[in-house]
Amino acid sequence: MMMNLSSVDDLNKRLPRPIKPIQFRGGFYLKMDKNEPYAEDSYDWVKVGNEAVFRRVAPCRRCILPNINPETGERDPENNPLKTLKTYRCFENNPSPVLGIHLGLRQGGKIKRGDVVYVGVQK
């Protein structure tokens, strides 16, 4: 799962208490040059570094897991961030909100923290 840190920043503006991105248990967290929350919704493919290429498989529909802090094991008493996400990130008559995207490996390769990330969007 990949998500844009601008998306988490936008969500944190809506929450009574901010959360850390790790609460979503993603595989990749993108820090973009431009602040574009939820830009990852439109990505068709992602290239990390010079070799690894991923294709977008599906939006990441959120379950209750992000309500549990991975550092403490405690569940948020107000059911956040899921409760807040449901107010603005539900699509296609599905009650599960979306945050991030699932990726499938298209071409393997080595990746490391700080690699340049390229994204493709079909028009």
Q: What residue ranges belong to the model's regions?
A:
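Metal-cofactor-dependent catalytic cores
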Residues: 1-123
